[in-house]
Amino acid sequence: MSQSSIAIQIEALLTYALQHGLITKWDIDASRNRVLDVLDLDELEPVEQVDVECEMPYPILENILDWAAENGRLEANTVTYRDLLDTKLMGALLGQPSETIRTFYERYEQQGPEEATKVFYDFSKQVHYIRTDRIAKNEHWFSETPYGQLEITINLSKPEKDPKAIAQAKHLQASSYPKCLLCKENVGYRGRVNHPARQNLRVIPVELNQEQWYMQFSPYVYYNEHAIVFSGEHVPMKISTETFARLLEFTEKFPHYFIGSNADLPIVGGSILSHDHFQGGNHAFPMAKASMEKTFSISRFPSVIAGIVKWPMSVVRLQGMDRSELVKAADHVYHAWQAYGDEAADIYPFTGDTPHNTITPIARRRGELFELDLVLRNNRTSKEHPDGIFHPHQEVHHIKKENIGLIEVMGLAVLPGRLKEELELLAEALLSSDPRQVIARYEQIQKHEAWALAIKERHAHLHDSNVMDILRDEIGKVFATILAHAGVFKRTGEGAAAFDRFISTLNQ
């Protein structure tokens, strides 16, 4: 790419920033000079105004990155180094974090929380913090199950590990700044080969339970307005009375959002246990659509409606108008569960001093009511189930063997990218006259053999136009099984009786 071509791309980027309100006409010269600084250029050939017709900046950024690779501005032309540079470029076009915060809260007061979060979400995409070009690669569908439609997504947006960056990271001095990917110190951080650049990250301060928390969006966006709400302090995940108070206060401030916390123990928790945080968003998950199949009362909290949700995992739902009463009721259920054991149901709360029982709590508004779903979890392991008794069992590991975190608990399966190609190969096998022989040819689908042959047996009329739909539907059924594995009280007569035994302890 010539010097005049890079000049055109830089002007295109400035025009894009102007069109999307990232800069004003008074900022153009200073912004151009910051971009030149990032690209180590002293001057530009003058160009006429450039017409730009793109909703997001990535087509322009890709052209600039190609020029950077050709002109020695990248250490290596790999995803890691390209990401470090394009983030720095977008950071050069942004104002101070205080400006984002001020406009967010002005909009919140004047137009309401729903409009404020929507505009902030659009902003996070427009500044390329949320990489919409990658998110678009994810596959998504619904599968009908006895618990309603479950959601499935195959995650293709996280880039593959970069071998050059991994090799380079080995030579870096160990760094504890920022302490983790969730710390507020990430805002504006330049990044390293082993820590993403965050010059284009902006966060919104939110006070919860008289503490300073912050809200941002997930760069990986598994659903609409996928928000992360994190503590201003780098403190570990811990479910407590304060957790329920924070969650419910958040739904008062943002009534169009659900918000939930991962459990605070290994195996049943999320991938980050070192920094207390929640996930929320403007999305109706399958679990939120599931009804209570049984209601009961907790004598200590007469104003609280309580029930068991029709769901493959074991969920106690609490509803009420009084936020503080609901916090106390949730705390009561949580502490009862922490100490609860039932040998007949294989539930043991402790091994020595090591606790096993915890919950995954989710809060939302249902009209005027506040609602809390408390998903009962236990992280015990055994010889038969070394990864976890209430965790995906061996027979479903060909689809998913990772922890069942908050998002999966609510009915959205986030499945590994490898499944896209594996499903295509399985479709080829199922349409052949000898599926077993085709499966034997491809090592990566051999783990699916028993499942695939069972599908073939169940579906006599497989053809080009329906095979992928059937495979996707069957994945939905496996996901329902995975959730049932994670349920502490099974969906059987015995399991229902065991659940009732636990419920009865709430009134003792």
Curated annotation (Swiss-Prot):
Molecular function per GO: UDP-glucose:hexose-1-phosphate uridylyltransferase activity
Disulfide bonds: none
GO BP term, pick one: galactose metabolic process
GO cellular component term of the entry, any: cytoplasm
Top-tier EC class: transferase
InterPro entries xrefs: GalP_uridyl_Trfase_II, GalP_uridyl_Trfase_II_CS, GalP_Utransf_C, GalP_Utransf_N
Localization (cell): Cytoplasm
Catalyzed chemical reaction(s): alpha-D-galactose 1-phosphate + UDP-alpha-D-glucose = alpha-D-glucose 1-phosphate + UDP-alpha-D-galactose
Pfam families (UniProt xref): GalP_UDP_tr_C, GalP_UDP_transf
This enzyme's EC code(s): 2.7.7.12
Keyword annotations from UniProtKB, A to Z: Carbohydrate metabolism, Cytoplasm, Galactose metabolism, Nucleotidyltransferase, Transferase
Pathway where it operates: Carbohydrate metabolism; galactose metabolism
Family according to the record: Belongs to the galactose-1-phosphate uridylyltransferase type 2 family.
Name of the featured protein: Galactose-1-phosphate uridylyltransferase
